[in-house]
């Protein structure tokens, strides 16, 4: 076992939510319109991008996952804006002496098209995390009609973060 503290930490996050009629579709703090009026089901606003980034941040520091801090059994978090949750997570990260070096995320969805909203999502995340938007990469892809995303049963997101000790 080493006693040397690392200068960098990497975290990986993943989230998926089911698409349901009657729910809002919010990704990266942006309200999108699904052609079939579908939205993401979840206890909070079910923002898969924000959730995967939170899990990556928490994972990088071995702090568990978002369910530990914002359990679905707690009504306080019902329908909450996930950017609020993300701001709480980044406060925790900074209290431990870490800063974001960069974030890279990929959203997996057949519809709606995500690309037209990427810059707005980056601005929302930049403002919430208090980092330059050049530190944030967001990509979108389809699943070529394979799996739950391909069958439009859900939307998922994978995120990787690099933290640097300050």
Swiss-Prot record:
Signal peptide per UniProt: none
Site (Transition state stabilizer): 43, 142
Gene3D superfamilies: 2-C-methyl-D-erythritol 2,4-cyclodiphosphate synthase
PANTHER family, sorted: 2-C-METHYL-D-ERYTHRITOL 2,4-CYCLODIPHOSPHATE SYNTHASE, CHLOROPLASTIC
Reaction equations catalysed: 4-CDP-2-C-methyl-D-erythritol 2-phosphate = 2-C-methyl-D-erythritol 2,4-cyclic diphosphate + CMP
Keyword terms: Isoprene biosynthesis, Lyase, Metal-binding
Family listed: Belongs to the IspF family.
Record's protein name: 2-C-methyl-D-erythritol 2,4-cyclodiphosphate synthase
Protein residues bound to a divalent metal cation: 15, 17, 51
Manner of cofactor binding, per the entry note: Binds 1 divalent metal cation per subunit.
GO BP terms: isopentenyl diphosphate biosynthetic process, methylerythritol 4-phosphate pathway; terpenoid biosynthetic process
Species the sequence originates in: Prochlorococcus marinus (strain MIT 9215)
């Amino acid at each position: 076992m080493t006693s040397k503290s690392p200068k960098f930490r990497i975290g990986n996050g993943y989230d998926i939510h089911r698409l349901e009629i009657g729910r809002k579709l919010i990704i990266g703090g942006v309200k999108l319109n699904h052609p079939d009026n579908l939205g993401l089901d979840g206890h909070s606003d079910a923002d898969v991008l924000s959730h995967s980034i939170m899990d990556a941040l928490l994972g990088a520091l071995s702090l568990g996952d978002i369910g530990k801090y914002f359990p679905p059994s707690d009504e306080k978090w019902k329908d909450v804006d996930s950017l609020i949750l993300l701001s709480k997570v980044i406060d925790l990260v900074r209290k431990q002496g870490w800063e974001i070096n960069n974030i890279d995320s990929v959203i997996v969805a057949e519809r709606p098209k995500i690309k037209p909203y990427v810059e707005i999502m980056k601005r929302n995340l930049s403002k919430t995390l208090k980092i330059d938007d050049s530190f944030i990469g967001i990509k979108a892809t389809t699943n070529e009609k394979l799996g739950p995303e391909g069958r439009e049963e859900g939307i998922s997101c994978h995120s990787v973060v690099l933290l640097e000790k300050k």
